[in-house]
C-alpha cells in the first residue's frame, strides 16, 4: 500500500440493506442497494493537499525501520497530492466516519458525516493504532497486538 494513494473503501449500513463505497481519490461516497443500484451519491468536500515534510519523514522512518527494501519504490509512487481520507466506517446511526489524512503529531483525525453527508463532528484518537468498531456505547480501538481500548463516545 502506498501512503496517501487512492483506496477502494466500503462498509455496510447498520440495517444491512445497503452498503457504502468510495474511491478515495474522487471524494465521493455512493450508497448502493443489494442489486448494486446507486441509491445516492454523497460529495465529500475535502481538499487534497500536498504531502508535508513531516509526513515524508514519518514515511521514510516507517519504511526504513520495517521495510527498507521497499522505501525507494514507495517514495517513487507517492502522489503529489494526498487523498483527503484513507478509511471509512459506518456506525449504528448510518453516520459515515472518515479517517482524514491530515498530519497530526500524536493523533489520527476522524470526520463524522451525518446520514445525509453533512459534517457533524471530528474525533481525535491516538495516532498509533486503529479504530476497530463503533457502537452506540463505545469506540473499539486497537493500539497493538496486546492493548485494546474502549473509548466512550461523548455527544
Roles of regions detected by a PLM:
Residues 1-155:
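Eukaryotic scaffold repeat domains enriched in small/polar residues
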Amino acid at each position: 500500500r502506498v501512503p496517501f494513494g487512492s483506496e477502494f473503501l466500503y462498509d455496510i449500513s447498520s440495517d444491512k440493506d445497503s452498503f457504502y463505497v468510495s474511491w478515495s481519490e474522487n471524494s465521493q461516497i455512493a450508497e448502493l442497494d443489494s442489486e448494486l443500484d446507486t441509491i445516492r451519491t454523497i460529495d465529500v468536500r475535502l481538499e487534497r493537499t500536498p504531502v508535508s515534510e513531516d509526513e515524508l519523514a514519518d514515511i521514510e522512518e516507517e519504511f526504513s525501520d520495517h521495510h527498507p527494501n521497499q522505501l525507494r519504490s514507495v517514495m517513487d509512487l507517492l502522489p503529489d497530492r494526498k487523498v483527503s481520507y484513507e478509511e471509512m466506517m459506518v456506525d449504528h446511526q448510518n453516520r459515515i466516519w472518515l479517517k482524514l489524512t491530515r498530519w497530526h503529531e500524536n493523533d489520527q483525525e476522524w470526520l463524522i458525516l451525518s446520514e445525509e453527508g453533512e459534517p457533524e463532528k471530528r474525533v481525535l484518537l491516538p495516532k498509533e493504532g486503529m479504530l476497530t468498531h463503533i457502537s452506540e456505547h463505545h469506540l473499539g480501538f486497537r493500539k497493538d497486538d496486546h492493548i485494546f481500548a474502549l473509548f466512550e463516545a461523548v455527544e
